[in-house]
């Protein structure tokens, strides 16, 4: 992946790279919805989505947090959330997953989904099930 992307735990405006060590602090305890990009460095679709994801993180500052998980380095997180393909975007609210997008998608599609999710996240949460830790 590109060397200009943030390293673990660093913040690039609204985009944080997370691991098992900081998962709870970044994702589980967030008051805002969090979208997590599960990616792998060997995947060209992950690399393509990275630029879109970073761009979208700027648009949603203060309304949604953005996080990245390298699945090669964090197999436990990928397994915990059933990530079978990269890239996968998994949306969380109050620490609970409630929506996912598998594969690369055009920016306008992701932006539209994110707007919809922000409008509906509390209702979506009431319909989601908590996954075991």
Question: Whereabouts are the PLM-identified features?
Answer:
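N-terminal leader/targeting and pre-domain segments
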Residues: 1-34, 111-133
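Short pre-active-site segment immediately N-terminal to redox-active cysteine/selenocysteine motifs
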Residues: 31-32, 39-42, 85
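Hydrophobic beta-strand anchors of alpha/beta hydrolase catalytic cores
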Residues: 35-36, 66, 89
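Typically the conserved alpha-helix immediately C-terminal to a functionally engaged Cys/Sec
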Residues: 45-60
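Structural microenvironment flanking redox-active thiols in thiol-disulfide oxidoreductases
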Residues: 69-78
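A short glycine-leucine-enriched loop at secondary-structure breakpoints
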Residues: 80-84
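Non-catalytic, surface beta->alpha helical segment in thiol-disulfide oxidoreductase systems
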Residues: 85, 90-126
């Amino acid at each position: 992946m590109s060397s200009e992307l943030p390293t673990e735990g660093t913040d690039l405006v609204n985009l944080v790279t997370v691991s098992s060590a900081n998962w709870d602090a970044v994702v589980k305890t967030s008051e805002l919805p969090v979208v997590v990009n599960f990616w792998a460095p060997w995947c060209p679709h992950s690399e393509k989505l990275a630029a879109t994801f970073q761009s979208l993180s700027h648009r949603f500052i203060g309304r949604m947090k953005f996080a990245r998980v390298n699945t090669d380095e964090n197999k436990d997180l990928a397994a915990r959330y059933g990530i079978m393909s990269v890239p996968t975007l998994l949306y969380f609210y109050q620490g609970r997953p409630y929506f996912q997008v598998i594969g690369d998608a055009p920016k306008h599609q992701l932006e539209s989904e994110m707007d919809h999710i922000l409008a509906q996240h509390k209702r979506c949460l009431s319909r989601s099930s908590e996954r075991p830790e």
